[in-house]
Curated annotation (Swiss-Prot):
Xref: PANTHER family: HEAT SHOCK PROTEIN 70KDA (PTHR19375)
Recorded superkingdom: Eukaryota
Stated family: Belongs to the heat shock protein 70 family.
Protein name stated in the entry: Heat shock 70 kDa protein
Alphabetized UniProt keyword annotations: ATP-binding, Nucleotide-binding, Stress response
Organism: Leishmania major
GO function terms (MF aspect): ATP binding; ATP-dependent protein folding chaperone
Database matches in InterPro entries: ATPase_NBD, Heat_shock_70_CS, HSP70_peptide-bd_sf, Hsp_70_fam
Length: 516
């Protein structure tokens, strides 16, 4: 039996969650351990592959072959500075096969194996698919998968590929804060008044801010911003560094960082202490025989934790200012500020946001861990033709987070689609040659907000050749950008005189484009 609808999957940096709409209600599905969220962890041993809780539970014994944080690698290049700095915190080995794409190498069943970030993510997606199948008692073929709103084209495409590898037809990629807004909007009900809602989504690895208006079932995103590399993991890292130094001080300079197992046990204790500090003002860490048989005990206060992560917490406010600016909205016009993501439980984060909005009461009505999967599942139901009184008339109008354009003479970034444009969208512009009798043009596609392409992100390039000889500026070359509802880009170019055309879909292999 095949389930004829689609499931909604929140593929998170640290935890993932799956939901399904059936019988007029939405269910967030518990996994085989009874947990409604599943760690985004995959482990390889001499005999098997483990995914989820089973993988995370054995991480201290098997740190080199337990992979997590694939979302911090997906769609990025190996020599990206972010990847290079993350590698310092990871016990597993990340290398590249010379094409600047990162691969993770592990020992599996006694031999060395390498996996791409998409393959690791596909294993987590597979686990979520199986969790849903066990619950539904049917095979699942389709899913809506969420990504951070600030994910770029490569990261979106790579996430879609991960779904395909997991045997899922990804009906749509949707933005996490927008999915959370659906959960919020459905939960709140409709009073017929337009509301301006700001979603503040701080998770395990990523941060998004989205400003939207909700009016009679229409969810219209006005602006989005964020940091694809900020979240709970970064706060854990600060604690790990702090306690590593503390251990050195108490034990004649012994450095526990030389042991991956010790570091992992410390990290697990730090994650626990961080959670404790959201409800208590101090937390104690106790680990027996942490390193060279030395027991470790230490206490940290909430105030100290806030000091260690102060710059990170404060950095969440700038994207909030940016979305208001982009949407040309005054902060006093925001009706609801909705918190999403586990890291929004941190009291300091809450007080910073509340203070920014003049002491406003924040909205905590939706479950910060489940809202994204909830919204994704509602969208999955609608996109597969589901009809319900509760969801009828629901329409999502999302935007593209980054400006898209091409390079023109002198390395100038010429924008075709500006950031925060509603998607799907299609824009064309006429360009010409800059030399007499120029036989072809080399079209380079970029995304980013800077004036020069060298400061933007190259998505890909292609050539349009066979232009008949003509003086410079005479040939008419129409370049068209077509951005679909997933936020994935197709670019085509046509020489008007001859009707010659060429096009590309920006694929996950950056710079190596699939010619249609």
């Amino acid at each position: 039996m095949t389930f004829d609808g689609a499931i909604g999957i929140d593929l998170g940096t640290t935890y993932s969650c799956v939901g399904v709409w059936q019988n007029e209600r939405l269910d967030i599905i518990a996994n085989d351990q009874g947990n409604r969220t599943t760690p985004s962890y995959v482990a390889f041993t001499d005999s098997e592959r483990l995914i989820g809780d089973a993988a995370k539970n054995q991480v201290a014994m098997n740190p080199h072959n337990t992979v997590f944080d694939a979302k911090r690698l997906i769609g990025r290049k190996f020599n990206d500075s972010v990847v290079q700095s993350d590698m310092k915190h990871w016990p597993f080995k990340v290398t590249t096969k010379g094409d600047d794409k990162p691969v993770i190498s592990v020992q599996y069943r006694g031999e060395e194996k390498t996996f791409t970030p998409e393959e690791i993510s596909s294993m987590v997606l597979l686990k979520m698919k199986e969790t849903a199948e066990a619950y539904l008692g049917k095979q699942v073929k389709k899913a809506v998968v969420t990504v951070p709103a600030y994910f770029n084209d490569s990261q979106r495409q790579a996430t879609k590929d991960a779904g395909t590898i997991a045997g899922l037809e990804v009906v749509r990629i949707i933005n996490e804060p927008t999915a959370a807004a659906i959960a919020y909007g459905l939960d709140k009900g409709d009073d017929g008044k337009e509301r301006n809602v700001l979603i503040f989504d701080l998770g395990g690895g990523t941060f998004d801010v989205t400003l939207l208006t909700i009016d009679r079932g229409i969810f219209e995103v006005k602006a989005t911003n964020g940091d694809t590399h900020l979240g709970g993991e970064d706060f854990d890292n600060r604690l790990v560094t702090f306690f590593t130094e503390e251990f050195k001080r108490k034990n004649k300079g012994k450095n526990l960082a030389s042991s991956h197992r010790a570091l992992r046990r410390l990290r697990t204790a730090c994650e626990r202490a961080k959670r404790t500090l959201s409800s208590a003002t101090q937390a104690t860490i106790e680990i027996d025989a942490l390193f060279e048989n030395i027991d470790f005990q230490a206490t940290i206060t909430r105030a100290r934790f806030e000091e260690l992560c102060g710059d990170l917490f404060r950095s969440t406010i700038q994207p909030v200012e940016r979305v208001l600016q982009d949407a040309k909205m005054d902060k006093r016009s925001v009706h609801d500020v909705v918190l999403v993501g586990g890291s929004t439980r941190i009291p300091k984060v809450q007080s910073l946001v509340s203070d920014f909005f003049g002491g406003k009461e924040l909205n905590k009505s939706i479950n910060p861990d489940e809202a994204v999967a909830y919204g994704a599942a509602v969208q999955a139901f609608i996109l597969t033709g589901g009809k319900s009184k509760q969801t009828e008339g629901l329409l999502l109008l999302d935007v593209t987070p980054l400006t898209l354009g091409i390079e023109t003479a002198g390395g100038v970034m010429t924008a075709l689609i500006k950031r925060n444009t509603t998607i799907p969208t299609k824009k064309s512009q006429i360009f010409s040659t800059y030399a007499d009798n120029q036989p072809g043009v080399h079209i380079q596609v970029f995304e980013g907000e800077r004036a020069m392409t060298k400061d933007c992100h190259l998505l890909g390039t292609f050539d349009l050749s066979g232009i008949p000889p003509a003086p410079r500026g005479v040939p008419q070359i129409e370049v068209t950008f077509d951005l679909d509802a997933n936020g994935i880009l197709n670019v085509s170019a046509e020489e008007k005189g001859t009707g010659k055309r060429n096009q590309i879909t920006i694929t996950n292999d950056k710079g190596r484009l699939s010619k249609d």
